[in-house]
Amino acid sequence: MDIIRKISHFAGQTFGIWVIVFAVLGFSFPSLFTWISSYITIFLGIIMFGMGLTLQADDFKELVRKPWQVIIGVIAQYTIMPLVAFGLAFGLHLPAEIAVGVILVGCCPGGTASNVMTFLAKGNTALSVAVTTISTLLAPVVTPLLIMLFAKEWLPVSPGSLFISILQAVLFPIIAGLIVKMFFRKQVAKAVHALPLVSVIGIVAIVSAVVSGNRENLLQSGLLIFSVVILHNGIGYLLGFLCAKLLKMDYPSQKAIAIEVGMQNSGLGAALATAHFSPLSAVPSAIFSVWHNLSGSMLATYWSKKVKKKQAGSKSSNLSL
């Protein structure tokens, strides 16, 4: 069990690297990964099942302690990223399938990787976890409505079908995880250390499947999509941070909201695009998955070093006194 725990910890710590490696492999050897496309929803369901296994009462304490911060985080999550996605799609005159793909990822809840990045950034991790959890639980209703509102300009959208898909891929697996944890608490406590490894496998499988199935599209439109994804992600971080700052949240909470808004559940975006739209519509989600892990790591490192530098400065000033 110790070996699995160590492997799982290593996989979680190097998550972004594995996503990049398998994205490159999917692009270079597409025939090895295209078969995974049929199982994208299943892989996402496994990840969400793992989330259900790890949920606990403490995750909702922040909602009770500072409800307004959690509410602001969820509202920011579901307004900033969809609006930025729509603005980029409309302003840059993106092709319909790419526009819908960008809007899809923008309308998704926050990704669980944001909790890790917030922790590394010395941010308010409890707030990050609460916002991710609440936004994910609201996703079956909110995400389809937002997609219908913002994407109907380019392609027809069926919110009912999207609602059912999100129930199947997100909410039902989370509930199943909670039920399993309720009846098999001791067994789950022993197995929970392997969940980061399971999540990494699930995400790299989804990314490699989308990339391998869109090799030609990436050769034609990859640079455009990558540029839009970088803008989308970066503007999300900035506006999330400014929103929290304007509302006078403390600095750790500002960092949490910035990361929470900027990082999306791109696996859900890829699953919805694959099931309801074209393969090309899934590409922005796949690229977002690669990029936001890189940018999130860089931002977390910057903020972490800033905190350490400040602490070192205060220690030296105390010594001089």
From Swiss-Prot:
Ranges in the topological domain labelled Cytoplasmic: 30-34, 93-97, 151-159, 212-221, 289-321
Q: Which GO terms describe its molecular function?
A: symporter activity
The record's Pfam families line, in alphabetical order, gives:
SBF
The lineage's top-level taxon is Bacteria
- What topology does the record note for this protein and the membrane? Multi-pass membrane protein
Extracellular membrane side: 1-6, 58-69, 121-129, 181-190, 243-267
Keyword Signal included in the entry's annotation: no
| Keyword field | Cell membrane, Ion transport, Membrane, Sodium, Sodium transport, Symport, Transmembrane, Transmembrane helix, Transport
A biological process from GO: sodium ion transport
Major location category of this protein: membrane
**InterPro entries documented for this protein:** BilAc:Na_symport/Acr3 (IPR002657), Bilac:Na_transpt (IPR004710), Na+/solute_symporter_sf (IPR038770)
Q: Which GO terms describe its cellular component?
A: plasma membrane
Transmembrane regions listed in the UniProt entry:
7-29, 35-57, 70-92, 98-120, 130-150, 160-180, 191-211, 222-242, 268-288
Q: Where found?
A: Cell membrane
Q: Record's PANTHER family?
A: P3 PROTEIN-RELATED (PTHR10361:SF28), SODIUM-BILE ACID COTRANSPORTER (PTHR10361)
Which family is this protein grouped under?
Answer: Belongs to the bile acid:sodium symporter (BASS) (TC 2.A.28) family.
The protein's name is Uncharacterized sodium-dependent transporter YocS
Q: Give the organism the record lists.
A: Bacillus subtilis (strain 168)
Provide the organism lineage as a comma list: Bacteria, Bacillati, Bacillota, Bacilli, Bacillales
Gene name?
yocS
